[in-house]
């Protein structure tokens, strides 16, 4: 089956130009100023931009969180991505019971029958021991080339600095990229306990108990650990201008340090958490200031931040209202869980449908 896209403006990484594009199966076979193909379905793209399908390198599909689960599965989530022009998503495998290989197999079983587009996977490493150390080198053979560690979420997801160093060192030796969720888990725990004790329960306290300096410090720590492990590092969902500075510093000292930010950190601020519907805007790390937005934009302009992803992780604002899913009415608890306590608000925003 051939498809001929005519009269469009083709956009590549380097330039944009008027041309026709001929596709056969899943491959582009010709780009030229004018193409004729009698056996092709013709799509007239006059006045339209023709872009490659997007890759969203950071999504969470069907993610359990606290008392609920995110509000899409691989069918609804991947369909939303396709409508937005994204044709590949990269989700995360949770490190649950069993081996890493078993966790990966379970994730594929969840995704393969429902995904409407291409997908790939990162592997979370939230528990480290000798068996995990032995398994890490095998991940590329299982199609996994990136792993993620956390410096926050104490007693749940966080690894200690020594464990992160060991993980990075193994990763660097075996062609794996280490992604880091960079916040200071100890400071968050102290400030959260104090806020609740003082009766602070509204959504804005999600940001106030996760100070921006925590992300800056944890990002520098991640870069420093990567330098000592002689391994590449990728800071996910950067939200602080100061994090951009840490990448610049690391690269100036020959550390292969990369970074990602997301639309929510470029267009919204912590002021949105003060709105009546502030729970909608709760994500981790939290939204920051307009000055941080400016710093992130500069990071994009200079190439310090190389990746724009979404950290897609949607929850219903009011999960008490049932929806029709696979022929049945179901209710999935959502942001209303935290109406009296900001720590119970599911952390996450939608985004995979936007590009």
Please report, for each region that a protein language model flagged, where it lies by residue.
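Histidine-rich, glycine-flanked metal-binding segment
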Residues: 1-4, 9-52
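Metal-associated gating/positioning segment near the N- to mid-region
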Residues: 46-114, 131
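Short acidic/polar active-site loop segments enriched in Thr and Asp
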Residues: 86-88, 117, 145, 306
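His/Asp/Glu-enriched, well-ordered alpha-helical/loop segment
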Residues: 201-230, 301-302, 307-308, 313-355
């Amino acid at each position: 089956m051939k498809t001929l896209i005519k009269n469009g403006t083709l956009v590549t990484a380097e330039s944009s130009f008027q041309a026709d594009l001929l596709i056969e199966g899943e491959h582009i076979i010709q780009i030229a100023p004018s193409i004729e193909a009698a056996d092709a379905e013709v799509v007239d793209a006059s006045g339209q931009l023709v872009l490659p399908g997007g890759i969203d390198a950071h999504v969470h599909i069907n993610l359990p969180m606290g008392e609920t689960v995110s509000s899409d599965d691989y069918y609804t989530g991947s369909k939303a991505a396709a409508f937005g022009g994204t044709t590949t998503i990269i989700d995360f495998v949770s490190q649950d019971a069993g081996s890493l290989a078993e966790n990966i197999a379970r994730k594929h079983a969840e995704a393969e029958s429902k995904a409407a587009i291409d997908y790939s996977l990162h592997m979370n490493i939230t528990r480290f021991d000798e068996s995990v150390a032995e398994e890490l080198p095998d991940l590329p053979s299982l199609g996994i080339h990136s792993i993620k560690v956390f410096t926050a979420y104490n007693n749940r997801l966080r690894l200690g600095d020594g464990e992160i160093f060991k993980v990075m060192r193994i990763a660097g030796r075996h062609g794996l990229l280490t992604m880091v969720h960079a916040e200071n888990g100890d400071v968050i725990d102290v400030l959260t306990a104090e806020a609740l004790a003082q009766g602070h329960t509204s959504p804005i306290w999600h940001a106030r108990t996760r100070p921006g300096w925590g992300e800056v410090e944890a990002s520098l720590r991640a870069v420093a650990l990567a330098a000592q492990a002689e391994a590449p590092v990728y800071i996910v969902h950067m939200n602080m201008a100061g994090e951009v500075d840490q990448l610049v510093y690391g690269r100036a000292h020959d550390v292969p340090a990369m970074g990602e930010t997301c639309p929510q950190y470029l267009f919204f601020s912590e002021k949105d958490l003060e709105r009546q519907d502030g729970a909608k805007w709760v994500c981790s790390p939290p939204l920051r200031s307009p000055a941080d937005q400016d710093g992130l934009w500069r990071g994009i302009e200079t190439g310090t931040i190389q990746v724009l992803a979404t950290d897609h992780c949607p929850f219903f604002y009011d999960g008490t209202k049932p929806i029709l899913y696979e022929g049945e009415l179901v209710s999935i608890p959502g942001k209303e869980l935290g109406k009296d306590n900001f720590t119970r608000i599911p952390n996450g925003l939608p985004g995979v449908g936007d590009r």
